[in-house]
Amino acid sequence: MVREEQEEDDNNNNNNGGGERKLLVADETVPSLLDETGLVCVTGGSGFVASWLIMRLLQRGYSVRATVRTNSEGNKKDISYLTELPFASERLQIFTADLNEPESFKPAIEGCKAVFHVAHPMDPNSNETEETVTKRTVQGLMGILKSCLDAKTVKRFFYTSSAVTVFYSGGNGGGGGEVDESVWSDVEVFRNQKEKRVSSSYVVSKMAAETAALEFGGKNGLEVVTLVIPLVVGPFISSSLPSSVFISLAMLFGNYKEKYLFDTYNMVHIDDVARAMIFLLEKPVAKGRYICSSVEMKIDEVFEFLSTKFPQFQLPSIDLNKYKVEKRMGLSSKKLKSAGFEFKYGAEEIFSGAIRSCQARGFL
């Protein structure tokens, strides 16, 4: 069997990720749980992470069913950046589904061997109540999980979690240490923290959803994998500016509002996120939480890095000490790396890829 994979070309990024294609001979473990068919489902297909994952899955040889929701007027979004991807005409199907109507995901899931649940029903800075957001998030998740069981073909379920589920853990590394998958945020620690950069609704809903997914998998014999990710940065094929890219480049955008500044920036390249998901899909055994974070930089290091590597933006000299920033701890990806995964991108690729995409779309 031959599979075709596209490597990112950091010198010539385009709307489809850029780069030259090379043929790879699939090893015997690819894909172990997908021997009969390479059909997978990706929810929230129009988003930053999901769209890049879809691109990589198609390049890897999988057939993909992507779900998207309609806009506020009930019309489908412009998803030409998905439908025009290489191999999309042969192996990509688009389904309309909404987390407010969990049963709407059933047609997309039927017959799939794996489901990547990337969709989340809110923005991290939303002002909706915790109860409203958490109820909608968990109900949507549970509906999708039940559809996975009903399909009788889904072997592995992936939930895209967030580093907010481990950042606010008080004594368990809350003093600026490093945390791993054994740590869970304490909601009260988060609420008592003076400087916050996300809403309590986002923190509580992500924790509730990840916990519910893991518990559901344990009770029903479904392999559940959760990928705990920090700021995801790098190039993007989606049409809008991803919020995580904007936050990471806030200084270049001339935005020094404190809500966009952190004591420590934990980041990972978008392609490493997609690669990690596919890696865990293709492993014969994968279960539970995996932190996926590769770069950790202090705020002054980010400022110095951007000023030095990208002098054309002429960042102003400022006293960063005057800003009240949220303090965050380090993240350990030891479990993921011990499983055999290798991160491919560092800080320079993370920032340069994001900047090129922003420039190509007129955001910078």
Curated annotation (Swiss-Prot):
One GO molecular-function entry: oxidoreductase activity
Compositional bias ranges of the Acidic residues kind: 1-11
GO terms under biological process: brassinosteroid biosynthetic process; brassinosteroid metabolic process; regulation of brassinosteroid biosynthetic process; response to absence of light
Keyword Lipid metabolism (UniProt): yes
Region of interest called Disordered, as start-end residue ranges on this chain: 1-22
Keyword vocabulary terms for this entry: Brassinosteroid biosynthesis, Cytoplasm, Developmental protein, Lipid biosynthesis, Lipid metabolism, NADP, Oxidoreductase, Steroid biosynthesis
Any single Gene Ontology cellular-component annotation: cytoplasm
Keyword Zinc: no
Disulfide cross-links: none
Cell compartments where the protein resides: Cytoplasm
Superkingdom per UniProt: Eukaryota
Note: The ben1-1D (bri1-5 enhanced 1-1dominant) activation-tagging mutant suppresses the bri1-5 weak mutant allele of the brassinosteroid receptor gene BRI1.
Family the UniProt entry places it in: Belongs to the NAD(P)-dependent epimerase/dehydratase family.
Quaternary state and interactors: Monomer.
Function summary: Element of the brassinosteroid metabolic pathway that regulates typhasterol (TY), castasterone (CS) and brassinolide (BL) levels. Involved in the control of organ elongation.
Listed name of the protein: Protein BRI1-5 ENHANCED 1
Source species: Arabidopsis thaliana
